[in-house]
Swiss-Prot record:
Residues covered by the BPTI/Kunitz inhibitor domain: 31-81
One Pfam family hit: Kunitz_BPTI
Site entry (Reactive bond for trypsin), positions: R41, A42
Name under which the protein is recorded: Kunitz-type serine protease inhibitor DrKIn-II
Gene3D superfamilies on file: Pancreatic trypsin inhibitor Kunitz domain
Length: 84
């Protein structure tokens, strides 16, 4: 196979991996955690994954501490945690 063909194949495989939905078994365990505002007192609008609704939702983060179920964008939350 030519190098151009290999690059095309690699690109297609990468695209497929990016677009493949995450099943519940492949979801990172931190997606199962409840949102934590943390110990600081800022009032930052953030996104967390809600396991019960299988949706990303808004919560307010204090700015420090908390856990990894804390995203700055909807896309980041969906890509990481939402199973279809």
């Amino acid at each position: 196979m030519s190098s151009g063909g290999l690059l095309l194949l690699l690109g297609l495989l990468t695209l497929w991996a990016e677009l493949t939905p995450i099943s519940g078994h492949d979801r990172p365990t931190f997606c199962n955690l409840a949102p934590e505002s943390g110990r600081c007192r800022a009032h930052l609008r953030r996104i967390y994954y809600n396991l019960e609704s299988n949706k990303c939702e808004v919560f307010f983060y204090g700015g420090c501490g908390g856990n990894d179920n804390n995203f700055s964008t909807w896309d980041e939350c969906r890509h990481t945690c939402v199973g279809k």
